[in-house]
């Protein structure tokens, strides 16, 4: 049975993909797995989730412990292109080293966005728990602002209010201000998809349920369990449902100069 499943897994990991993905999310989940010396340690599994031109979600690929470099990510996205993908409009990621350059070497027009949830996590490491709620509300005033001007003002407020006591937290946002500013090049509904990671978080929380206990013998055992989870529970949960608020997002993608022609080609 296992061998049959592994054949299915291999086929699934190399299956043809859609020609366009409006949004792609890259995130990672850690699993305990034996290394080449038989020692159990942590390995990163990168999960790539796509939302197609019609708002449907699918996991495009799983990649175990890739070296975080431009050439590795270039190979990964080259293999995604070889499976039929012609264009990716937006890609959201945690600041994975080399990913942005790797994507752009294959899909030069893709807009790469730092995931806001990860920026919040990285900045709140510096904030004591009693202030978390207030700090997060001030962060939301920035990335959830109605326009760039309000976002810039909210950042100044954040800096004035928290900068003296918690400079580490402010530094995280300061270093990524270009990603906050970039959000405001797009209408509100597209912005929301770009900065929220609900889609990939739900995939990862489902996968975490099967990685909690024990460890994996090898990469194949990881792929097998993840494949069964993705094509079983997650496929049932998604049940061909479109991404929330998709009609509005599609309208905005169809009106934007930089995406209208690119998406029109692929809508039935």
Model-derived features: positions:
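Conserved beta-strand -> loop -> alpha-helix junction used to position metal-binding or nucleic-acid-contacting
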Residues: 1, 90-97, 102-138
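Acidic/histidine-rich catalytic cores and adjacent linkers
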Residues: 141-268
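Conserved, well-folded catalytic cores of nucleic-acid-processing
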Residues: 4-8, 12-15, 32, 51, ...
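RNase H-like nuclease fold core
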Residues: 2-92, 97, 101, 106-109, ...
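Amphipathic alpha-helical transducer elements in NTP-driven molecular machines
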Residues: 23, 42, 70-74, 93-100, ...
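Residue-level signal for pocket-adjacent positions within structured domains
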Residues: 58, 102, 118, 122, ...
């Amino acid at each position: 049975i296992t061998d049959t499943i592994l054949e299915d897994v291999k086929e699934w990991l190399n299956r043809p993909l859609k020609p366009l993905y409006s949004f792609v999310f890259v995130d990672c989940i850690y699993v305990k797995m034996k290394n080449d010396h038989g020692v159990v340690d942590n390995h990163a599994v990168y999960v790539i989730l796509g939302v197609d031109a019609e708002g449907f979600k699918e996991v495009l690929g799983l990649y175990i412990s890739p070296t975080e470099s431009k050439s590795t990510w270039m190979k990964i996205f080259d293999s995604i292109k070889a499976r039929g993908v012609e264009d990716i409009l937006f890609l959201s990621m945690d600041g994975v080293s080399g990913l942005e350059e790797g994507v752009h070497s294959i899909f030069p027009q893709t807009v790469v966005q730092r995931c806001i949830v990860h920026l919040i996590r990285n900045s709140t490491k510096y904030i004591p728990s009693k202030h978390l709620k207030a700090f997060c509300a001030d962060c939301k005033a920035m990335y959830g602002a109605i326009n760039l001007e309000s976002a810039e003002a909210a950042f100044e407020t954040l800096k004035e209010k928290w900068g003296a006591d918690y400079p580490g937290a402010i530094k995280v946002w300061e270093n990524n201000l270009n990603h906050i500013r970039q959000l405001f090049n797009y209408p509100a509904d597209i912005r929301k998809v770009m900065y929220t990671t609900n889609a990939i978080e739900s995939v990862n929380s489902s996968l975490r349920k099967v990685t909690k206990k024990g460890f994996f013998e090898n990469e194949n055992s990881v792929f097998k369990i993840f494949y069964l989870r993705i094509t079983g529970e997650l496929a049932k949960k998604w049940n061909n449902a479109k991404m929330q608020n998709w009609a509005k997002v599609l309208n905005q993608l169809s009106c934007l100069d930089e995406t209208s022609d690119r998406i029109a080609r692929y809508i039935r």
